[in-house]
């Protein structure tokens, strides 16, 4: 963009063309101040731009306007303007050129910027200033404890996060729900005082990881036994002995949930102490886990020794999905045991070497950062979701082994999905 625009008026005592005027300017200024300041040389070096000529014929004369862009400094631009004024003939006719103005393009641009800034400032000042009352009201709403909702056909007291979360916390009554909501636990639902486990709870337990959080008294023991006989329970948390969930502080709630024990571990400990009912409940829980896992039941072989490669027969032509047999090293079972209750995942390469161990909540984002084919398998103490399957398919993951399988709308045929119960 040029720094200056030389604006001049031209008058010729005869009828001439535009190129005649331009030729006269170049011809009559050539060599006046040496080759370095010749107009053609300056134009070749982009120091001045193309000369624009606008003319019209009036009473046998040619009159018009010249515009010459200049990238020279102020002194040199003024000299070029004076050189142009020195032209006194165009062809056989007398001519007069007079510089009318030299426009500083940068100043014009600055002026436009200032004008626009003033306009923006006026528009900005018209906007409504923030109302402190509205701000305080928004802050108050943010701190407001959400009210329990009525969930399912049985109208069970529940928090607003039950549907969105992949884990639910089952408590006894409405007061327990209110107390957990007060401290930010929104994925909580109550049994609602029912003698039997409501169907809503049964259905949720088939799709989500379940944490049972009950009072530390005999009543809590009875409710826990009923739940263990009816639904798949993943973790068991209890209030301190003699205390109720509804009276716990936020710190006590977090501490109790952080100490939640995997159901298998809880029952095995009681069974070792000779508790026959615990042995029975352990068998019930294993059966319930298998029933949930049968949503997707592939063939799997856990190898006791180093696998020997065998030719894989071509799959039969059928509309049904065919899942091929897969060899999993025995040590992966130890990795699964180490994952129980941690809510963590381990990524493996094609040789079943551990690539990374990370929290389940970071799994999708971590996969997103990895290149394709970097991860062959994922073992995770969590629930397999459609979002995870979609990302795993994108990254060419071949296998996912998890504690539980959530609601899946589509499973790519190239991904094998297993639960811990399939392996253990």
Curated annotation (Swiss-Prot):
Catalysis: reaction(s): ssDNA + n NTP = ssDNA/pppN(pN)n-1 hybrid + (n-1) diphosphate
Enzyme class: transferase
Entry GO MF terms: DNA-directed RNA polymerase activity; metal ion binding; poly(A) binding
Disulfide cross-links: none
Record Pfam families: Toprim_4
GO terms for cellular component: cytoplasm; DNA-directed RNA polymerase complex; exosome (RNase complex); primosome complex
Main function: RNA polymerase that catalyzes the synthesis of short RNA molecules used as primers for DNA polymerase during DNA replication. Also part of the exosome, which is a complex involved in RNA degradation. Acts as a poly(A)-binding protein that enhances the interaction between heteromeric, adenine-rich transcripts and the exosome.
Subunit relationships: Forms a ternary complex with MCM helicase and DNA. Component of the archaeal exosome complex.
UniProt-recorded name of the protein: DNA primase DnaG
């Amino acid at each position: 963009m040029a720094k200056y625009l030389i604006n001049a008026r031209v008058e010729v005592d005869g009828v001439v063309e535009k190129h005649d005027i331009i030729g006269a300017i170049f011809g009559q200024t050539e060599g006046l101040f040496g080759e370095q300041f010749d107009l053609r040389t300056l134009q070749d070096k982009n120091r001045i731009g193309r000369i624009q000529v606008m003319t019209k014929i009036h009473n046998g004369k040619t009159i018009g306007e010249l515009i010459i862009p200049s990238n020279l400094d102020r002194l040199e631009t003024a000299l070029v303007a004076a050189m142009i004024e020195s032209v006194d003939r165009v062809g056989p006719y007398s001519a007069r050129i007079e510089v009318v103005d030299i426009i500083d393009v940068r100043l014009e641009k600055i002026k436009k910027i200032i004008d626009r800034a003033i306009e923006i400032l006026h528009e900005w000042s018209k906007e409504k200033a923030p109302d402190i009352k509205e701000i305080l009201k928004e802050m108050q709403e943010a701190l407001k404890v959400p009210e329990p909702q009525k969930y399912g056909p049985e109208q069970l007291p529940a928090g607003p996060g039950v549907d969105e979360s992949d884990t639910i916390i089952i408590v006894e009554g409405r007061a327990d729900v209110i107390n957990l909501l007060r401290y930010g636990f929104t994925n909580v639902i109550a049994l609602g005082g029912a003698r039997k486990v409501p169907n809503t709870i049964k259905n949720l337990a088939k799709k989500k990881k379940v944490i049972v959080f009950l009072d530390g008294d005999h009543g809590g023991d009875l409710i826990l036994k009923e739940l263990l006989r009816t639904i798949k329970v993943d973790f068991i948390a209890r209030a301190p002995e003699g205390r109720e969930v509804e009276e716990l502080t936020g710190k006590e709630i977090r501490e109790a949930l952080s100490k939640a024990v995997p159901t298998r571990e809880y029952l095995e400990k009681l069974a070792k102490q000779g508790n026959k009912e615990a042995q029975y409940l352990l068998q019930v829980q294993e059966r319930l886990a298998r029933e949930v896992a049968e949503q997707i039941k592939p063939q799997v072989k856990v190898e006791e020794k180093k696998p020997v490669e065998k030719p894989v027969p071509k799959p039969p032509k059928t509309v049904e999905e065919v899942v091929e047999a897969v060899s999993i090293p025995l040590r992966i079972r130890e990795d699964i045991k180490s994952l129980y209750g941690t809510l963590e995942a381990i990524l493996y390469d094609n040789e079943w070497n551990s690539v990374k161990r990370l929290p389940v909540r970071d799994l999708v984002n971590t996969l997103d950062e990895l290149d394709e084919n970097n991860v062959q398998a994922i073992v995770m103490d969590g629930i397999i979701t459609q979002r995870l399957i979609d990302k795993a398919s994108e990254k060419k993951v071949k296998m996912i082994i998890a504690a539980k399988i959530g609601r899946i709308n589509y499973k790519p045929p190239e991904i094998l999905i297993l639960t811990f119960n399939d392996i253990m």
